[in-house]
């Protein structure tokens, strides 16, 4: 085949001749930027106005490295000039009108460092003088406050004692401050024990102060014998509480009763009931029935007067009931609420008194149903002459009635799921 009839190569494009290619000359580099981390330069083309300037990647201007270096040197010179102006403005001396840094040599850097150190030293000295003047002024104004603080105090102020006129404690007359103090009997008694205040001439305050120190409070325990039916932990807490209250009432003041309304809501016990309760503790140990009777009589006074002494029969009944009640309460307290189980009566299959199954001695009539439990197979069968249905093990009847068993299993239908 000739060359004219060859297939053209679609992948190749014929380039125009080199004679018609225009060459563009770079006149100057005007700017620099970064796009996606890659540097680009603003190129001014010779023979074209500034509107035709283009951004070219730095790789495309490799033959213009002299112009790129000239642009970088110009940028460095401008940055250096701006830094020199900023340093000149920060100086306080008026003589420094122009920038001092002209060369980047070692001698110029030493001079600038020495000058900056001298300026910093002058500034720190001026600030220290200003601080000293301020401190002197503060000391002059604080002299009066020191005199007030050093004034001797005649009485320890507190929030519970000082009234609305308590700001006069630090005045020149210490005697006037003591008259403006509100004296509560409890605080006064505490201060009198510690000798913090002088005894006052008011009769009302002296009467309300405590004359005798309060007695120590303790719970009264019942003496027990070896044959006592119950321990001290089974004693009702109401009786111990009511016996300890007379001791508490003897230690309280009239001022304590007037301080809060919550103290009035507490149960009070009369002198007669307290004497009776103390007599009970001094006598012989009581049984649980007598203790219950005494607590009930103390709760209702008129009901106790109408009732007589407890009989022996009643005490015995109370004791018998209390043992069962205590045992139930203790069992309920031991296990938490979530773990408590309901108690059901024991269920047992009734014992067979009559013959059952093969023991009937009758012939097999029909096999009705079968069920398997674990590895055992049971058959529901009826006997001839008996209407009841019995469940027997297959091993008991497979030797005597094999044909009927086979006939039953053949009659079953096998259901295949769809």
From Swiss-Prot:
Superkingdom of the organism of origin: Eukaryota
- Which compartment or compartments is the protein found in? Nucleus; Chromosome
Q: Which gene encodes it?
A: rhi
- Protein's name in the database: Chromo domain-containing protein rhino
**Any Pfam family matching the protein:** Chromo
Query: Does the record bear Nucleus in its keywords?
Result: yes
What information about domains appears in the record's comments? Answer: The Chromo domain mediates binding to chromatin through interaction with the histone H3 N-terminal tail. Binding requires di- or tri- methylation of histone H3 'Lys-10' (H3K9me2/3).
Q: What happens when the gene is disrupted?
A: Females are sterile and produce eggs with various polarity defects.
Q: Where are the stretches annotated Disordered?
A: 84-167, 199-337
Which is an annotated GO molecular function term of this record? Answer: chromatin binding
More info: Wild-type eggs possess two dorsal respiratory appendages. Mutations in rhi/Rhino results in partial or complete fusion of these appendages resulting in a single appendage from which Rhino gets its name.
According to the UniProt entry, which residue ranges have a biased composition of type Polar residues? 152-167
The record's function comment reads:
Involved in piRNA (piwi-interacting RNA)-mediated transposon repression. May be involved in formation of the perinuclear nuage, a subcellular structure implicated in RNA processing that may be involved in transposon RNA surveillance and silencing. Required for ping-pong amplification during piRNA biogenesis, probably by promoting transcription of piRNA precursors. As part of the Rhino-Deadlock-Cutoff (RDC) Complex associates with, and drives non-canonical transcription of germline specific dual-strand piRNA clusters 80F, 38C and 42AB, but not single-stranded piRNA cluster 20A.
Q: Quote the cellular component terms of the Gene Ontology held in the record.
A: chromatin; heterochromatin; nucleus; pericentric heterochromatin; Rhino-Deadlock-Cutoff Complex
The upper taxonomy is: Eukaryota, Metazoa, Ecdysozoa, Arthropoda, Hexapoda
């Amino acid at each position: 085949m000739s060359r004219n009839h060859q297939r053209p190569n679609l992948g190749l494009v014929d380039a125009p001749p080199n004679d018609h290619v225009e060459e563009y000359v770079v006149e100057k580099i005007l700017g620099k930027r970064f796009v996606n981390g890659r540097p680009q330069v603003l190129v001014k083309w010779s023979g074209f106005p500034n509107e035709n300037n283009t951004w070219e990647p730095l790789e495309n201007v490799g033959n213009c490295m002299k112009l790129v270096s000239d642009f970088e040197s110009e940028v460095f010179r401008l940055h250096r000039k701006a830094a020199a102006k900023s340093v000149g403005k920060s100086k306080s001396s008026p003589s420094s009108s122009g920038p001092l840094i002209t060369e980047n040599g070692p001698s110029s850097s030493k001079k600038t460092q020495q000058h900056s150190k001298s300026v910093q030293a002058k500034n720190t000295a001026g600030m220290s003088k200003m601080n000293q003047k301020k401190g002197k002024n503060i000391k002059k104004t604080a002299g009066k406050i020191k005199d007030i603080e050093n004034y001797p105090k005649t009485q320890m102020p507190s929030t519970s004692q000082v009234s609305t006129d308590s700001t006069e404690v630090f005045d020149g007359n210490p005697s006037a401050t003591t008259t403006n103090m509100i004296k509560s009997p409890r605080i006064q008694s505490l201060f009198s024990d510690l000798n913090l205040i002088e005894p006052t001439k008011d009769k009302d305050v002296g009467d309300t102060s405590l004359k005798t120190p309060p007695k120590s409070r303790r719970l009264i325990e019942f003496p027990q014998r070896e044959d006592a039916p119950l321990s001290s932990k089974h004693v009702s807490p109401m009786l111990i509480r009511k016996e300890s209250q007379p001791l508490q009432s003897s230690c309280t003041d009239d001022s304590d009763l007037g301080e809060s309304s919550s103290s009035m809501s507490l149960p009070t016990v009369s002198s007669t009931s307290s004497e009776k309760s103390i007599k009970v503790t001094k006598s012989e140990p009581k049984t649980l029935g007598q203790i219950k009777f005494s607590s009930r009589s103390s709760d209702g006074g008129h009901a106790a007067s109408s009732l007589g002494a407890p009989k022996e029969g009643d005490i015995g009944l109370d004791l018998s009931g209390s043992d069962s009640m205590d045992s139930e309460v203790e069992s309920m307290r031991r296990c938490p609420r979530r773990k408590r189980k309901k108690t059901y009566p024991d269920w047992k299959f009734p014992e067979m008194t009559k013959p059952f199954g093969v023991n009937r001695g009758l012939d097999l009539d029909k096999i009705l149903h079968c069920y398997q439990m674990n590895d055992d197979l049971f058959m529901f069968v009826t006997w001839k002459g008996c209407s009841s249905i019995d469940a027997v093990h297959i091993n008991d009847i497979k030797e005597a009635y094999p044909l009927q068993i086979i006939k039953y299993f053949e009659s079953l239908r096998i259901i295949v799921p769809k």
